[in-house]
A protein has these predicted regions:
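Active-site phosphate-binding strand-loop segment of PLP-dependent enzymes
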Residues: 114-169, 182
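Conserved beta-loop-alpha segment that forms the PLP phosphate-binding cup at the N-terminus of a helix
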Residues: 53-81, 85, 89-93
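Active-site-proximal loop->helix
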Residues: 91-102, 120
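General beta-strand structural signal in soluble alpha/beta enzymes
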Residues: 5-7, 56-59, 105-106, 132-133, ...
């Protein structure tokens, strides 16, 4: 019997997951196309996003999915507030630097969460378009107050992007209770799947407005 992987991800996979990988699929086969559509629909249902959101699967890591979200769904003239309390907030900062996006940062220690009043102060004193937040910071396991952040961002009429890698599928994230424009996650953490598939759940109108943003 294989030992259990006590890591954030990849996780130990179930026998049913392993058995599902025994089959070969042609990318243009009807069964594969239907399976892909079914998976996308199921992921959208996890955020109660039917008819409002689309799932964009990415053949790559969770970081690749986050980078795709940042690069394709923001504009060159966007101004972003990045909330940082660990390595993955820092990673979004690095992405914005490489992409040439204008941003400010609010960083606290890895064992602390961000103060909502301070976030509001930063929003009110800067001409922002987006706020980037990590739901569960993988490096420490700390949970950020995503519902409070989302309510504040919605009230300021800004766009919220969430890195939910270590939360998606395990912690509440419903579009019926909080407002967000895009969330990135992956197959190999709380969903207990195999590595290699990241995905972004994005509002229909946001993906329509992103036409022409992609670098490839």
């Amino acid at each position: 019997m294989d030992k259990k992987l006590l890591t954030p991800g990849p996780l130990t996979t179930s026998m049913s997951t392993k058995e599902a990988m025994l089959h070969d699929w042609g990318s243009r086969d009807t069964k594969f196309i239907d399976l892909n559509a079914s998976i996308r629909d199921s992921l959208v249902k996890l955020i109660d996003g039917e008819d409002k959101y689309q799932c964009v699967p990415m053949q790559g890591s969770g970081t690749f999915a986050v980078e795709s979200m940042v690069s394709s769904l923001t504009q060159k003239d966007s101004k972003i507030l990045i909330l940082i309390n660990g390595a993955y907030g820092q990673r979004m900062k690095k992405m914005c630097t490489y992409l040439g996006r204008d941003f400010i940062e609010y960083e606290v220690a890895e064992h602390e969460v961000h103060d909502i009043n301070k976030i509001e102060e930063l929003i009110d004193s800067n001409n922002l378009t987006h706020v980037f937040a990590v739901y569960c910071e993988t490096t420490s396991g700390i949970l950020n107050p995503i519902e409070d952040i989302a309510k504040l961002v919605e009230g300021k009429n800004l766009s919220l992007f969430i890195d939910a890698m270590s939360a998606f599928g395990a912690l509440p994230l419903s579009s019926k209770t909080i407002t967000f424009d895009a969330v990135a996650a992956s197959s190999n953490k709380c969903l207990e799947g195999v590595p290699g598939v990241g995905f972004i759940l994005v509002k229909n109108e946001v993906i329509q407005n992103a036409k022409g943003n992609s670098h490839s």
